Amino acid sequence: MIQLEGVSVDFSQGKQPSNLAVDNVSLHIQRGEVYGIVGTSGAGKSTLLRTINLLQRPTSGRVLVNGVLISELAGQPLREQRQKIGMIFQHFNLMQTRTVTENVAFSLKAAGKSNAEITLRVPEILSLVGLSDKASSYPAQLSGGQKQRVGIARAIANDPEVLLCDEPTSALDLETSAAILALLKEINEKLGITIVLISHEMSVIKAVCDRVAVMTGGRVVEEGDVFDIFATPQHAFTRQLVSHTLDLALPPRLLEDLQGTLLKILFVGESAEQPVLSDVATRFGVSVNILHGKIEYIGNRALGILVALLTHPSDPEKVAEAVEHIQVRTANVEVLHG
């Protein structure tokens, strides 16, 4: 559906040294999926996203959307392709002197729709985003979440094939963010729109995306299924993002006073719901002290993570045997101490 091939964006001018915001990125985004791009500020996420609809023209590389080499277009052909790509922003960009209905109608008028078509389409799209009762309201009368819903309505009014989302929840509180993400997922499922969403928060990616690319320093350092990225991150930067999101850090003082073997245990799928630790306690006579733990559900798959301290009153070999048993029964075991 969307192919980025060796895309780079260099903001240097004249004889200035190279200033690469995006450095040789290649991605293949499948039709109908919700694809995330995550990274910290300055990673190049927004710049990369804007190459998809050519709001930012690549310095080098190719951008194809639905088989069309959009990076080579200009003028009317480019405008026609952009009508197939909706976009929402973190700061809404609504027209303050126009009602909700007029804001949505504006994008339809710009696409050349007739008044009759607009009259039919606007109520339909406002119903989809849950704003039927706000049709006559002005942006100043809306909450942040409602403003973003108007932005979404405007972006999908012309039935785009692709919806680009530039940090759509960063200006919203947690509850409102969750509602907006649920709406985006609903739109993806109902309308089949391919969504590309960027965020600096892995929690946003976890909530709504099917696959994700991790960016830092203008490069994609890791890409894959969201569950796999959380379960087995490969790159150090990805591990840092995941660890921060899952909040598994232990106080340094606690680590200093530990006696025994400290494990971080990853449970995937059915193993996340099995009594693995109670089994080893019974079988090997070890004491199991759980210091931290949680089960996350990513999509319909369970990911359990526990930090546990294993001790035995007299036989350290029993602890080693217990660790081996846990390794067989679970996806991954990391010895943190001991």
Swiss-Prot record:
It is found in: Cell inner membrane. It comes from the Bacteria. It is a peripheral membrane protein. Residues 2-242 form the ABC transporter domain. ATP binds at residues 39-46. It catalyses: L-methionine(out) + ATP + H2O = L-methionine(in) + ADP + phosphate + H(+); D-methionine(out) + ATP + H2O = D-methionine(in) + ADP + phosphate + H(+). Part of the ABC transporter complex MetNIQ involved in methionine import. Responsible for energy coupling to the transport system. Belongs to the ABC transporter superfamily. Methionine importer (TC 3.A.1.24) family. This is Methionine import ATP-binding protein MetN 2. It comes from Pectobacterium atrosepticum (strain SCRI 1043 / ATCC BAA-672) (Erwinia carotovora subsp. atroseptica). The lineage of its organism: Bacteria, Pseudomonadati, Pseudomonadota, Gammaproteobacteria, Enterobacterales.
